[in-house]
């Protein structure tokens, strides 16, 4: 079903591009900013910060967006990632390190500017702007802006760039119906920014879902045009949609239509704001359920969160570059940093930059020594010797008579369990490197 829908969307997109070609590129197909979740950096010491900053600079990163530095759980408890004296945070769980201070101090003088994410509440996902909780959050965010500006930004003014409004809007029905309340809350936050450093931009990063109750792109354009017109945006503010490919809410084939929609919405809103792109460099796992393809994404081959190989990531950035002024990503630190993950992804990206946005094309060698065995539970196991590559192998893809069976990531064993193996079945294994180059297939018959 997913492949059929992809094909239909691809045909529609091709026709649309013939009628209305993509505009000329507005930026290079590369990212210069990244999101970093506060929980991840909460235990970084200065040495780790400097390691991350060094590799971010190698990758050309200029903007570091710290995600929510205060988060409210469904039971009302707060987790706060900076030293705050706000009454609302009394009794909160404070992180081991002050993320705001650490980010600003370590980035000071590095050439990387920090955007600070404000508050978030877990009930956003099932309430959106309805009820008192959202309005109260915006009040808290306004107080956070004043406090953080006074205690941190004034000390590190050259490292600070702006603010990130963390609740993630979408084209879902709850967001649409409560959008007047959401806009009112954002206006409150902008007022707070104006009272501190009026030149500081506010960044929003919503997403589009082609699943659920309102999957039509034209409907989304009407919504975003109306919503953007309601917010008191200033010329420095940034509308930076997630492309939602990594999370599975969008097919890659649909990206030209979606970015055209966002571009049109900004133009038709009458707001003089910046359109950036948040291109996702990961793939979320999604499992088969009764809602797959209806309200939730289709199942994925990967069963864990994985780094997207650079071929897909580059295609995302190339499309976005025709509509967006600038590209950032979620998340270099989580999925591409050699300090946190395998260096092959960082090295492949650097090679891409150094070679003028051309992907390296050397394929891995084919897996060898394929063999079947039986584990202690009596399951059939297919194992193999690892492939080699000039930079690194990201994963292996296993098929049975041409149909997908399993995927093995670079950190996993070179073996997969075969359910209900049948005599005469031909199993094939293909290795993929960090650029997405496939090896020749290695085969074995059961």
Functional labels for PLM-detected ranges:
Residues 95-110, 131-162, 220-232, 320:
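An active-site-proximal structural segment forming one wall of the substrate-binding cleft
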Residues 119-121, 145-178:
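Active-site groove signature of glycoside hydrolases
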Residues 355-391, 436-446:
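Pro/Thr/Ser/Gly-rich low-complexity, intrinsically disordered linker/stalk tracts
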Residues 49-58, 62-123, 179-202, 254-257:
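Aromatic-lined substrate-binding rim segments of carbohydrate-active enzymes
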Residues 387-401:
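Solvent-exposed loop/turn segments flanking beta-strands in beta-repeat/beta-sandwich domains
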Residues 418-437:
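Beta-strand-rich modules
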Residues 236, 240-251, 265-359:
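Substrate-binding cleft of secreted/luminal carbohydrate-active enzymes
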